[in-house]
Amino acid sequence: MVVNSDPDWLWRGTAEIFPHNADSNNPQEHLGILTQQDRPLRVKLGIDPTGTDIHLGHSIPFRKLRAFQDAGHTAVVIIGDFTAQIGDPTGKSEVRKQLTADQVKRNAESYLAQLKPILDFDTPGRLEIRYNSEWLSNLDLNKILELLATMTVGQMLAKEGFAERFQKENPIFLHEFLYPLMQGYDSVAVNADVELGGTDQKFNIAVGRDLQRHFGKTPQFGLLLPILLGTDGQQKMSKSLNNYVGLQEDALSMYSKLEKTPDRLLGEYFELLTNLDLAELPENPRECQKLLAKEVTAQFHGVAGAIAAQKTAEDIVTQGKAGNTDSVPEFSLAEITFPVKLAYLLSASGLCPSSSEGRRQIKGGAVRLDGDRLEDVNQEYADPKMLINKVLQMGKKKFIRLIS
């Protein structure tokens, strides 16, 4: 009888491992067994630095990568400085804008700085950081033709994103077909035993397995992780949808956003974003929200920073005060006409002298509502119910409570 020897950390928050033959004692067919062999595994995770910011959704595969590190394995982080100039077409309904080498370099530096609270950068042998331009920029035409010959156009068109664009007769450029092959060749170049990715990366990871087999190497395992829903509970976390929590956000902003996590997302967030025992969580959803906010904020700002953020958030929302301010003045929303622009509200409430100054403060990141930073200079509120009993803040010392 085969006993499931998978360690708990391997499956926590994991959507799928492939191949995963639970009836086999062969390590080459069972990642759980392979993780407990004598040699450390080489666990690959690639990122294309297409922007400067990482949010909690991006952090999930890196948290799993850290779990592999803590179990004694080697994390191989691939900075896709070459592939970022193409852009991953996965899930995209149109061609991605190509980046310059300088843009990619700056973005990569920002990404690595944000990952330091998550990954183990210090223990010898636990982390390799590689740039795929090391090998991809040296591919000659013969090698590129060899890669192209491993797949058919039909296989490529079956990929999510390509299929939709083909059906809608939207253009698909030939260089985009190279992306999965290049990501797959990364696995060949670094001798990956395991590749991590979101559930949307299964096609690309499977291509890596095929290419490793083509070049006479042992095919990697794929470990897929869920795509995190955003704080709205509706769509995947995304900066463009403004439902994200950025890793570079200050402690108060991070805490305030997470404290409002919808009840139905709490279990998922605890499983994917913390190491807490899920069986020991508070029964009260409100207490769960506070615990989640405090736990995640502490990962990036330390325990002291999380405690301070919690106290400030509670002072603003529940006690009507902030820091050393004993009370907050009130402004009646009945004095203005709705819909109302945020910039005008800042001026009408007396927090700033004019709407133009209000827009400048919003652009500068100085405006918050109940602790949440507001960044859209065109933000508009259609109904006073959206604002009643909330605290509007500008800078560190100016607060006003909005009442009916």
Swiss-Prot record:
Supply the name of the protein: Tyrosine--tRNA ligase
Describe the family membership recorded for this protein in Swiss-Prot or TrEMBL: Belongs to the class-I aminoacyl-tRNA synthetase family. TyrS type 2 subfamily.
Record gene name? tyrS
Q: Could you state one GO cellular component term attached to this entry?
A: cytosol
Task: List where the motif 'KMSKS' region lies.
Answer: 236-240
Q: Does the keyword RNA-binding apply?
A: yes
Indicate whether Electron transport appears among the record's keywords. no
- Please give the superkingdom of this protein's source: Bacteria
Subunit (UniProt): Homodimer.
Its Enzyme Commission number? Answer: 6.1.1.1
Which catalytic reaction applies to this protein?
Answer: tRNA(Tyr) + L-tyrosine + ATP = L-tyrosyl-tRNA(Tyr) + AMP + diphosphate + H(+)
The organism encoding this protein is: Synechocystis sp. (strain ATCC 27184 / PCC 6803 / Kazusa)
Which UniProt keywords are given for this protein, alphabetically ordered?
Answer: Aminoacyl-tRNA synthetase, ATP-binding, Cytoplasm, Ligase, Nucleotide-binding, Protein biosynthesis, RNA-binding
The record's listing under InterPro entries reads:
aa-tRNA-synth_Ic, Rossmann-like_a/b/a_fold, S4_RNA-bd_sf, SYY-like_C, Tyr-tRNA-ligase, Tyr-tRNA-ligase_bac-type, Tyr-tRNA-ligase_bac_2
